[in-house]
Amino acid sequence: MVLRRDFLTWCNETLQTALFKDYAPNGLQVEGREYIGKIVTSVTASRAAIDFAVEQKADLLLVHHGMFWKNELPTVTGWKKERIAALLRHDINMAGYHLPLDAHPTLGNNAQLADRLGFATEKRFGEQNLLNSGSLKQAKTLGALAAHIETVLQRKPVVIGKPEREIRRVAWCSGGAQGFFQTAIDEGVDLYLTGEISEAQYHLANETGTAFISAGHHATERYGVRALAESAAEVFGLEVCHFDENNPA
């Protein structure tokens, strides 16, 4: 068991949350019991994740996507009321870490994604160093790499580019980072991988020759929150359980 305060201090210091300009609060979002012995992780603080945390008798739900975002209505009604009420009813804490959890060099979503896909990280760049670039250990065709990504992430990616195109240098950023495609193009990489795609990326890929893969917002962000919880569990002797959803987005 660990005091909630000590656990949150460790997370904040590990992820260096004070260094980031974020559009979501990082840290405790819903307060529950004072001591933490069991953590449930989830990409998002969905009602399904909360119900699972209740079933597991968890003390903390640790997520990447919390329930509060800048520029949204500051009201607690409807689905948000139901989620928060369930947490409060069972005295469960909910903490979320957003951009700091994307960017951490070992525990973050980008680092964990690279480990699973076999990317060797050589550089962090772009806005708040949220993008990563590096080289494949062995060059692959775009088609072969897309098949590998599908196998690892268990989700069919959206691929823009010729399947036979050789891929050596890759840039990536988990989640909804399609807006950084031009930044990746400027790095001179062969491929940019992220979680989502918008209409404009199709044209940019075709007109610049830089391949683009959208591998799923949820799928590319499963692993950071798990790594953070498992690291904390080693430090504090906690029990950890992971929740996942079949989210196609």
From Swiss-Prot:
UniProt similarity note: Belongs to the GTP cyclohydrolase I type 2/NIF3 family.
Annotated Pfam families: DUF34_NIF3
Keywords per UniProt: Metal-binding
GO (cellular component) term, any one: cytoplasm
Keyword Metal-binding: yes
Taxonomic path: Bacteria, Pseudomonadati, Pseudomonadota, Betaproteobacteria, Neisseriales
Superkingdom of this protein's organism: Bacteria
Protein name (record): GTP cyclohydrolase 1 type 2 homolog
